[in-house]
């Protein structure tokens, strides 16, 4: 995964999990949930790397800043936007036939888990992101312990 870092993607390991963070501008136009062509390319590369890890559970979280949306249609607020973004990321990733949809969970976190301040442009930009949280599937381990 390290080779994918940079250009809007960061990787952190903590508490036995791997966190992959994708900046909004890599994937989406502001306030939108449709993935752009650059984002599709990045997600396809990520899917290729993830496809070698069959024993992972992957939570895809959408995060927004705290600016309310003035949305109409399907996306009415930051909750909707964060969920739709997470879901669309998963839909691109699972186009890779080696990734099993059962490995994935989509979650919308809206503006409630910021990594920076929402009081300035740079902080809000940091908060608008997709995070993939990779955790080992421990089912086989638990079966051994029974």
Regions found by a protein language model. Give the residues of each.
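Short secondary-structure junction motifs
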Residues: 8, 55-57, 101
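Extracellular/lumenal/periplasmic "stalk" regions immediately C-terminal to a signal peptide or transmembrane helix
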Residues: 1-14, 19
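Periplasmic OmpA-like peptidoglycan-binding domain that tethers envelope proteins to the cell wall
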Residues: 27-41, 49-53, 63-145
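Short amphipathic alpha-helices and their capping/turn segments at secondary-structure boundaries
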Residues: 5-11, 43-52
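Short acidic-rich active-site patches of cyclic nucleotide enzymes
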Residues: 17, 24-25
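Pocket-edge structural micro-motifs
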Residues: 13, 22, 134
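Structural motif
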Residues: 17, 57, 127-129
């Amino acid at each position: 995964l390290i080779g994918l870092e940079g250009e809007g993607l960061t990787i952190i390991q903590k508490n036995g999990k791997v966190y992959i963070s994708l900046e909004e501008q890599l994937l989406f136009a502001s306030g939108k949930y449709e993935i752009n062509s650059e984002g599709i390319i990045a997600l396809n590369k990520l899917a290729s790397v993830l496809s070698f890890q069959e024993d992972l559970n992957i939570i895809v979280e959408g995060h927004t800043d705290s600016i309310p949306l003035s949305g109409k249609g399907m996306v009415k607020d930051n909750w909707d936007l964060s969920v739709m973004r997470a879901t669309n990321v998963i839909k691109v990733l699972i186009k890779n036939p080696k990734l099993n949809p059962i490995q994935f969970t989509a979650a919308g976190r809206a503006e409630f888990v910021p990594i920076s301040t929402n009081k300035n442009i740079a902080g809000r930009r940091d908060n608008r992101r997709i995070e993939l949280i990779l955790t080992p599937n421990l089912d086989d381990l638990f079966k051994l312990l029974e």
